[in-house]
Amino acid sequence: MNKKELFDAFDGFSQNLMVTLAEIEAMKKQVQSLVEENTILRLENTKLRERLSHLEHETVAKNPSKQRKDHLEGIYDEGFHICNFFYGQRRENDEECMFCRELLDRK
């Protein structure tokens, strides 16, 4: 193997390493994004569990249908969907959801 072939082989190897490094950086960013999303979801889950525990321990004697509606209103006011389409998902920027509002406005 002469010097030119050796140099070309190293150059090709270097190019492959650069491509691999770029792919690894992209995967690293994706994993970081997933970890951040996972952390947010864990915090939301913890908050929902605390809220559920709090509601289960309340011993307020209310009309059962009124109590259910109040419970749904509380969840909605905390920024979560209560409609069948997106139940439990966080409302982005606490924007109104027409499906959730329809449920809350029922008599």
From Swiss-Prot:
Q: What is this protein called?
A: Replication initiation control protein YabA
Protein's job:
Involved in control of chromosome replication initiation. Inhibits the cooperative binding of DnaA to the oriC region, thus negatively regulating initiation of chromosome replication. Inhibits the ability of DnaA-ATP to form a helix on DNA; does not disassemble preformed DnaA-DNA helices. Decreases the residence time of DnaA on the chromosome at its binding sites (oriC, replication forks and promoter-binding sites). Tethers DnaA to the replication machinery via the DNA polymerase beta sliding clamp subunit (dnaN).
Subunit organization: Homotetramer. Interacts with both DnaA and DnaN, acting as a bridge between these two proteins.
Predominant location of this chain?
Answer: cytoplasm
**GO:BP terms for this protein?**
DNA replication
Q: What family is reported?
A: Belongs to the YabA family.
Which residues take part in binding Zn(2+)? H81, C83, C97, C100
> Could you name the Gene Ontology cellular component terms for this entry?
nucleoid
Q: How is the cofactor bound?
A: Binds 1 zinc ion per subunit.
Disulfide cross-links: none
This protein's species is Streptococcus pyogenes serotype M1
User: From the record, what ranges are coiled-coil?
Assistant: none
State the compartments where it is located.
Answer: Cytoplasm, Nucleoid
Q: Which domain of life is it from?
A: Bacteria
Q: What UniProt keywords are attached to this protein's entry?
A: Cytoplasm, DNA replication, DNA replication inhibitor, Metal-binding, Zinc
Q: What cofactor does its activity depend on?
A: Zn(2+)
Question: InterPro entries from the xrefs?
Answer: YabA
